[in-house]
UniProtKB/Swiss-Prot annotation:
InterPro entries hit by this protein: Dimethylallyltransferase, IPT, P-loop_NTPase
Source domain of life: Bacteria
EC number(s) on file: 2.5.1.75
Assembly and oligomerization: Monomer.
Region (Interaction with substrate tRNA): 36-39, 158-162
Role summary: Catalyzes the transfer of a dimethylallyl group onto the adenine at position 37 in tRNAs that read codons beginning with uridine, leading to the formation of N6-(dimethylallyl)adenosine (i(6)A).
Coiled-coil residues: none
Site-annotated residues for Interaction with substrate tRNA: T100, R122
GO MF term set: ATP binding; tRNA dimethylallyltransferase activity
Protein's UniProt name: tRNA dimethylallyltransferase
Swiss-Prot/TrEMBL keywords: ATP-binding, Magnesium, Nucleotide-binding, Transferase, tRNA processing
Keyword Magnesium belongs to the record: yes
Similarity comment: Belongs to the IPP transferase family.
Length: 295
């Protein structure tokens, strides 16, 4: 009987990690599990570069495109869904692939059991961030939870308001909650870990080509479909690649050319942040490669 293997493949957007996962899954007779926070959402098939029907016909893919964009899907919910898959497929080899570093970390290290934060509280703090700015809220966070505040940048608005909303709801510091973790679903020693980071210029050229291709394939129709849902701009799905820029185009605030160029710029910046995070957070147990050919 072939021994079950678990493989983790992380990398920035457009790096080729999905193609690598497909290639390895065929060799290992494995299932592919989404480890990307945007690819869980329905509607956003093209904008989030979900696997094609041809890909899913070759290898079974799980946790893709099954969550309503109207929901605020969390890493905790993703872990619950992964746990169900691990229970269902007890002997099947698995490949986790994606670009969301926090998902990989939660998978290998466990997750703090922070109570649910309501959409109303989330929206309250996002409005305050827009009105007061990250610096002002960071000073408030320093008074409440200096331990966590000193770990992050004073410009990191999302993590600042995350800590503030947790304190708002629970009355306890985020640094306190982070000490209370669930056991990891996968032992770090029982998996093959691959970090795919291609040369930056190659990656940027791929980003430009992919966005042009997304437009040709109907990305604007997806944006329009999302607009018709009249969702809160604070929902994660509304921040998918191209959504803010092309929404501004439909609303008459940008020309199509400016929206496309801004989408390319923001995607390059996102890829750069991903690469920085992976390099800083992942240890030497991850095998660093620059192309699929190295596997």
């Amino acid at each position: 009987m072939t021994q079950r293997t678990i493989t983790l493949i992380a990398g920035p957007t457009v790096s080729g990690k999905s193609a690598l996962a497909l290639q390895m899954a065929q060799k290992k007779n494995a299932l592919i599990i989404n480890t990307d926070s945007m690819q869980v959402y329905d509607v956003l098939n093209i904008l989030t570069a979900r696997p094609t029907e041809a890909d899913t016909a070759i290898v079974p893919h799980y946790l893709y495109g099954y969550v309503s964009p109207a929901l605020h899907y969390s890493v905790g919910q993703w872990l619950c869904d992964v746990r169900k898959l691990l229970t269902t497929f007890t002997s099947k080899s698995l490949i986790f692939v994606g670009g969301t570093g926090l998902y990989f970390r939660a998978l290998l290290e466990g997750l703090s059991e922070i109570p649910h934060i309501s959409d109303a509280v989330r929206q309250k703090w996002r409005l305050r961030l827009d009105k007061e700015g990250a610096e002002n809220l960071y000073r408030q966070l320093l008074r409440i939870d200096a331990v966590f505040a000193e770990k992050i940048s004073s410009q990191d608005g999302q993590r600042i308001i995350r800590a503030l909303e947790v304190y708002d709801v629970t009355g306890k510091k985020l640094s306190w909650w982070q000490k209370k973790k669930t056991p990891p679903l996968i032992s770090p020693n029982c998996s093959e870990k691959i970090l795919l980071i291609p040369p930056r210029q190659w990656l940027y050229e791929r980003i430009h080509k992919r966005l042009d291709n997304m437009i040709e394939r109907g990305a604007l129709e997806e944006v329009f479909a999302m607009k018709k849902l009249m969702l809160s701009p604070f929902l994660p799905a509304m921040k998918a690649i191209g959504m803010p820029e092309f929404t501004a185009y439909f609303d008459g605030y940008k020309s199509f050319e400016d929206a496309l160029e801004m989408a390319k710029t923001q995607t390059r910046r996102y890829a750069k942040r991903q690469m920085t995070w992976f390099r800083n957070q992942f240890d030497e147990e991850w095998t660093l490669i620059s192309s699929c050919e190295e596997v």
